[in-house]
Amino acid sequence: MNAWMILAAEAVQEAEGGLFDLDATLPLMAVQILVLVFLLNAVFYKPFGKVLDDRDQFVRGGRQDAKARLAEVKALTAQYEQELAATRKQSQALIAEAQTEAGRIAAQQLAEAQREAQAQREQAQQEIDQQKAVALQALDQQVDALSHQILDKLLARA
């Protein structure tokens, strides 16, 4: 065990120096750090930054595209609503016109039917009057004939 203590004491005496020894270790560590920084920058940070920039551009492009499409959709919606309102007005005008035309046609047909009915009634009245005149004339003839027969029978009895 003494041998180990002696070796440890010699090692402590040989490692004399302050906090910073100016030997080749310090510049070598600085070179290693610079090489590590350049390697990390080339291998990791630049590609990672490029991916982030590409993603940011993609998101911005998507947003701009979405805004443009939204504006287009709003414009088309407004246009379609205007066209729909115009079409509704036209259809209402057509319906009103059709109703007016149907009313006019119905009134014409009703007037025509009334005229035809009046004409048929007048014709029937004329036929009835003619038949009445014929019947009255036939009755007058029969009355005359019966009156002559009655008169002849009365005169024949007397």
Curated annotation (Swiss-Prot):
The keyword Transmembrane helix applies. The chain crosses the membrane at residues 24-44. It is found in: Cellular thylakoid membrane. InterPro entries: ATP_synth_b (IPR034679), ATP_synth_b/b'su_bac/chlpt (IPR002146), ATP_synthase_B_chain (IPR050059). Its main location: membrane. It is a single-pass membrane protein. One of its GO terms (cellular component) is proton-transporting ATP synthase complex. The keyword Secreted does not apply. Keywords: ATP synthesis, CF(0), Hydrogen ion transport, Ion transport, Membrane, Thylakoid, Transmembrane, Transmembrane helix, Transport. It comes from the Bacteria. Pfam families: ATP-synt_B (PF00430). One of its GO terms (molecular function) is proton-transporting ATPase activity, rotational mechanism. F-type ATPases have 2 components, F(1) - the catalytic core - and F(0) - the membrane proton channel. F(1) has five subunits: alpha(3), beta(3), gamma(1), delta(1), epsilon(1). F(0) has four main subunits: a(1), b(1), b'(1) and c(10-14). The alpha and beta chains form an alternating ring which encloses part of the gamma chain. F(1) is attached to F(0) by a central stalk formed by the gamma and epsilon chains, while a peripheral stalk is formed by the delta, b and b' chains. F(1)F(0) ATP synthase produces ATP from ADP in the presence of a proton or sodium gradient. F-type ATPases consist of two structural domains, F(1) containing the extramembraneous catalytic core and F(0) containing the membrane proton channel, linked together by a central stalk and a peripheral stalk. During catalysis, ATP synthesis in the catalytic domain of F(1) is coupled via a rotary mechanism of the central stalk subunits to proton translocation. PANTHER family: ATP SYNTHASE SUBUNIT B', CHLOROPLASTIC (PTHR33445:SF2). Belongs to the ATPase B chain family. This is ATP synthase subunit b'. It comes from Synechococcus elongatus (strain ATCC 33912 / PCC 7942 / FACHB-805). The lineage of its organism: Bacteria, Bacillati, Cyanobacteriota, Cyanophyceae, Synechococcales.
